[in-house]
Structure formats: structure tokens, C-alpha cells
Amino acid sequence: MIRMSKRLGVILFVSCISINSFAKSMEADVNAVPEYNYDNIPYYENEGSLLVKMRLNGVFAHAKQKNLPAPTVPQPLPVGEFVKNGYGGDISTTIFFNNYFATELSLGFNVLRTKNSVLSNVSYNYGVGATPGKSKPLYMIPATITGQFHVAPFGGIRPYVGLGYHGSYMITQSSGIKIRNGNGFVGQIGLDFYAKDDTVINLDIKQYYLNPKIVYKPSLVGNQNITSRTKLNPLVVSIGIGFSF
């Protein structure tokens, strides 16, 4: 019995030494882990309630015509898309009500070009066959307001979506046509990349819904004006820089 007690005592003593050594080893390993410096994590803070952006635009338009009167010639030519794709720019101010909701006011200037082949075909279809000359620019100047929802307003990349309305002033230098002003809804998606606290790289896409009237003048189609509508609906893809205040 005494021998067994001694053996148990020895075993207990050795176990205590082993447990103590293991605990010290674990403590050393924990202390050896370096502390992470959280000050090195990039943090983007936007304290400003105004964000001013300047952007360059690529304009993609189809401009299919509709509601043209019946041609006066027996074998009319097809009338295709009215304008070519174009380019432009805009400037905007985004007003933040809180971190998630904002409104954007923008004014743009976009340049498209009329297609001579379409003007020639329209002139032929109404018995005139006039030659429209060189392709002329078509200017679209949209004033736009959108309400925005910023999906993830914290961090370096901040996506947003928007919905709004626009009024577009239309000008053309072509002597044979006149295009009316138009208005309609606007859909918007975009990304703000915060390079610094107050500097933003912006990628923005707007879908304009625009169906302006086109008036073909007598010099192109005969004795009286001919009116149609064109489904312009330009898609404007923009990239630019912004600053928060």
C-alpha cells in the first residue's frame, strides 16, 4: 500500500511538472504573436454633404423613326437609324441627405451626327431626291435630376442606383430638318472610387428615355413639312473625377 502511494505521488508530481511546462510553452507562443497595427488599414471617410463631379461621356443612340407618312414613290427606300453615336461631357452636384440617400443635379453637352443616307432616303421617298450635303452635328443638352440610393456608403468603393427625370434641349445645324426639345425618365447606376477622403473617381451609366419630334423641311421633302418621331433613347456612359465638400 505504501509503495502504491509512493508511485501515485511520483506520477502526480511528474504530471504537475508536465502541465506547468506545457502552460508556459503556450504562454510563450501567445506572446510571440505580433500585434496587428490597425492604423495601417485604409479608411475612407466622407464628411461632406456635397460631391461635385466632372465627366466625359460616350453616347450610344439608335434613333429609330416612327409615324412617318406613307411615301409618295412606288418603290420607297428603307429609312434606318437617324443619328450616329457621339460623345460629350457633363458636370454634376450630388447633395447627400444622409449616408444612403442623395439627389444629383447635372447639366450635359453631347454631340451626335445625323446620317446622310437616312436624309437622302427620306427625301427620295417623298419625290424630291435632294442631296443633304455633309453630315451635320446634332447637339443634346440635358438638364437632369435623379434621386440616388447609395448601396454601400462606407469604404473605398461605393455603388449607387438612381431614378429621375430630364429635359433635353436639342439643336441641329442641318438646313433640311429641325428637331424638337424633349423630356423623359432617366435610369442610373454608378460607382464612386474614393482615392482619398475628398477625391473620387466616378463611373456612371445613364439611360435616357427620349422620343423627340423631327420636322423635315420643304427643301428636303417637297412642298410642306413632314413630321415624325425618333426613338432616340441614348445610353450615356461616363467616367470622371469628383471632389467632396
From Swiss-Prot:
UniProt keywords, alphabetically: Cell outer membrane, Membrane, Signal, Transmembrane, Transmembrane beta strand
Gene Ontology terms describing biological process: transmembrane transport
GO cellular component, one term: cell outer membrane
Signal peptide limits: 1-23
Disulfide bonds: none
Subcellular location: Cell outer membrane
The family this protein is said to belong to: Belongs to the OmpW/AlkL family.
Protein name as it appears in the record: Putative outer membrane protein RBE_0022
